[in-house]
């Protein structure tokens, strides 16, 4: 199969050129009319994106501020907790010392009371013993006088010693 000269492949070159021209005109019209709208849409989209970026920056800035405030509040809370802990330890130590002091004072008072009680009972026993010894001594003296002396001498001596013992205060 051979092709005749001058006819080519059988394509109509004229139609191809017309199609290219028509395509160029359509593209030009589309660019002319749609280009403004497309530019407007792109500008609106760009403006929306920029606004979103500004809002995101603003929200990020607010978030940073809130984070910093929260961080400061956390530091203040930690300081307050440390202060409360140290005050609690100080108060516990003070209370412990007060309890120990009170215990020592109570112990000293009990010891003093014990000593006073011992002294009281010692004095009571000495007093009873003294009275018992004096009465026994008087009985022995009376017995000796009753055996050896007459009644008149006995009465004189007894009155003398009774007077002396009644004047004596231990």
Curated annotation (Swiss-Prot):
GO terms for molecular function: proton-transporting ATP synthase activity, rotational mechanism. The keyword NADP does not apply. It is a single-pass membrane protein. It holds the Pfam family ATP-synt_B. Its main location: plastid. One of its GO terms (cellular component) is chloroplast thylakoid membrane. The chain crosses the membrane at residues 15-35. It is found in: Plastid, Chloroplast thylakoid membrane. Keywords: ATP synthesis, CF(0), Chloroplast, Hydrogen ion transport, Ion transport, Membrane, Plastid, Thylakoid, Transmembrane, Transmembrane helix, Transport. The keyword Transcription regulation does not apply. Belongs to the ATPase B chain family. F-type ATPases have 2 components, F(1) - the catalytic core - and F(0) - the membrane proton channel. F(1) has five subunits: alpha(3), beta(3), gamma(1), delta(1), epsilon(1). F(0) has four main subunits: a(1), b(1), b'(1) and c(10-14). The alpha and beta chains form an alternating ring which encloses part of the gamma chain. F(1) is attached to F(0) by a central stalk formed by the gamma and epsilon chains, while a peripheral stalk is formed by the delta, b and b' chains. In plastids the F-type ATPase is also known as CF(1)CF(0). F(1)F(0) ATP synthase produces ATP from ADP in the presence of a proton or sodium gradient. F-type ATPases consist of two structural domains, F(1) containing the extramembraneous catalytic core and F(0) containing the membrane proton channel, linked together by a central stalk and a peripheral stalk. During catalysis, ATP synthesis in the catalytic domain of F(1) is coupled via a rotary mechanism of the central stalk subunits to proton translocation. NCBIfam families: PRK07352.1 (NF005606). This is ATP synthase subunit b, chloroplastic. It comes from Stigeoclonium helveticum (Green alga). The lineage of its organism: Eukaryota, Viridiplantae, Chlorophyta, core chlorophytes, Chlorophyceae.
């Amino acid at each position: 199969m051979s092709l005749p000269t001058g006819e080519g492949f059988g394509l109509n070159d004229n139609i191809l050129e017309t199609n290219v021209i028509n395509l160029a005109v359509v593209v030009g019209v589309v660019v002319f009319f749609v280009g403004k709208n497309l530019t407007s849409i792109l500008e609106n989209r760009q403006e929306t994106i920029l606004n979103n970026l500004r809002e995101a920056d603003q929200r990020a800035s607010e978030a940073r501020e809130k984070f910093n405030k929260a961080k400061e509040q956390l530091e203040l809370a930690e300081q307050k907790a440390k202060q409360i802990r140290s005050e609690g330890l100080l108060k516990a130590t003070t209370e412990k010392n007060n309890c120990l002091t009170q215990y020592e004072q109570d112990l000293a008072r009990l010891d003093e009371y014990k000593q006073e009680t011992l002294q009281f009972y010692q004095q009571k026993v000495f007093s009873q013993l003294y009275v018992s010894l004096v009465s026994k001594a008087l009985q022995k003296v009376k017995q000796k006088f009753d055996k050896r002396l007459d009644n008149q001498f006995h009465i004189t001596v007894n009155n003398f010693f009774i007077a002396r013992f009644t004047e004596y205060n231990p």
